[in-house]
Amino acid sequence: MIRGMASPKGRRCGKRWVAACAATAFLLGCGGGGGSSASFVGWPTVPAPGGGHEPAPDNQARLTGVFAGGPVVGLDYRGSVTGARKTDAQGRYHYAAGETLSFSIGELPLGAAPAADALSPLSIGGAISSADPRATNRLVLLQTLDADGDLNNGIQVTGAIRDIVSRHAAAIDFTQAATAFRASLAPLLAALDAAGAFTDLDPRPRSARSAVAAQEHYTRATAARNLVITTGGTLRGFESSATTWQYLGIPYAQPPVGALRWRAPQAPQPWSGVREAVAWADQAAQVQALERFGEGGMSEDSLYLNVTAPKLASKLPVMVWFHGGGFTSLTSNTKPFNNPNALVSKGVVQVSVNHRLGALGYIAHPALSAESGHGGSGNYGQMDLVMALQWVKANIAAFGGDPDNVTVFGESGGGRKVLSLMASPSAAGLFHKAISQSGTLIPDTRTLASAEAVGLALQKRLGAASLEEMRSRPWTEVVAAASVLVPYTNIDNGYLPYSERVSFESRRHNDVPFMIVVNTNDTPDPIETVKNVFPWMTAHSASRHYAALFSQVPGGWRARGVKTYHAGELAYVFNAPESVVTHYLLDLVIDPATGGKLAIGDLNGNGVSGSAGDTQDILASAGFDSADAKAIENSMAIWTQFAKTGNPSVAGLVDWPAYTPANDRFVELGAAPVVRTGLSSVFP
């Protein structure tokens, strides 16, 4: 990490920083060992008293450069005039005008270049673009070696890392193809793991970053930049489109690890200096196979959010997104959920939130209830969402958002989290509108005793003698032990002091304008909610409620009779046709003829079918057409209009009646919205 910045894993910057961002000192002048064709520039020396040599005296006027693409602390460099040094605690290197700088990690040479405050891989070593393997492989190595795994506070190369890299230098060849280079790092990473050289909170062995992830991080870090001052400190985001700024990996709470596991979230530690906001933070700890569906790593250190805002934003409505996956899975760290060309393009500020999941976020236990101070336990993931909303209230104005006009929305498990927040007194005043997409509400909330039984079952499966021992186990063991358990929200005498039924029927819930969305071929629980629970909610609410049946499905699948599946609306709301690939891989796209997963052949002739996971085949099979493009525009307009006004009616598109049990009115969202009657009869 960079000194002066916390390690919890606006205004436009000046031209000098933007110029530096166009370059990096991930130098391409030479390869490493194992096939490198260029030689390392030797260190300049002068005779030392008593014999031997030492670096040339630093009697030149020193200039300063900072590595773009992520400041690197502890990187070795030598100047032909100034001698040998390491980049300092802010990732800076110093040089004299006219000298040559050579960089290395211990004995592993990285390259050399004429000294300047901005060193570019495109101007050193003949690279054509940042996709040149010599550039990409250096990016992969440096980002992989970051000691604490948090690229938002820079890359830290410690002495231990430097020494072990030196011992493996001969095996590192920067001229290899990306896949081969990544594989070649396995022995080095195994040695670093064995030595305990990494300090991040993921107990799993460190793996090399992919070439795509490394290039994307470099692109974000070298884009135009923007500063925002928050209650925690100053953030530096990046230009995510010509009209938007984006800020990734913003901490809204302390890492819930060690003694903070299974406790209410704690306010984050502030930082001094500037914290970068260009790297995805970790996804919440969960089944490891699901990591591929999101960006960033995976660990308990996951209490971060992302903000996307128009460049000229001023007091715009705010939309806060909660991801699906029940209470156990998935992440908000996806490109579709943070698409700058989606909802934000319609005049809102969007926030996406990650929070604790599964047994780490939603179990209770008698010992936890005894220590909590409110006579209950559980709902830690929901408490995270409350703290994220508190962060939004305190900080979103700095990004151009209106803290008094906040809409929470989510799909599937995210919709369920929205409904839970509507029932919680802890969330009072933190949001002003709500959208539940395929969410489920069970009015008779799980009791504390029932939830504590799940916690006791987890303890037994862990073979732990005490709560202290449970807290000491790696998250990977906790997730594995909870594989057959079903943790979710419960009455806890704190976040939920009473059942959701009591909350609504006593009218103590957060009574805000509400829109419920269900898909034509949705799963049973959301259908049950829209048929039987939604009318009950409306009867106990003063605010207007609206209902939508989403029926649009991509053209290619529409032609095969596929009905809109669970999560099917997300491709439209987030202007992300590519998201149907994830939906398909999660077995959500159903063949009406068989009731099973839709079969997709080898449409591009590469020998791998869509059914076997070829993403190009899946997207081609979906076949988005002009009707889908229209549905995308309509969906974004409707969702953002509701966020702006509390009414989804859009002039010239749809005059949306509020739902009541008496009128039974809803809107079907196909290629064009149509007002209909008979929500209660849509599903048999």
Question: Where do the language-model regions lie?
Answer:
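Short glycine-enriched nucleophile-adjacent loop
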Residues: G415-A427
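Feature for extracytoplasmic/surface-facing segments of secreted or surface-associated proteins
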Residues: S36-A224
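Substrate-access "cap/lid" subdomains that shape
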Residues: L290-F293, M387-Q390, A394, A428, ...
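Alpha/beta-hydrolase active-site loop
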Residues: S302, H374-A397, A453
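Non-catalytic accessory segments of hydrolases
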Residues: A221-G376, Y584-T594, G601-D602, G607-V608, ...
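C-terminal subdomain of alpha/beta-hydrolase-fold enzymes, centered on the catalytic histidine
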Residues: V484-V486, N490-P684
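Alpha/beta-hydrolase fold nucleophile elbow
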Residues: P317, G400-E411
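C-terminal motif of bacterial Sec signal peptides marking the signal peptidase cleavage site
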Residues: L27-G29
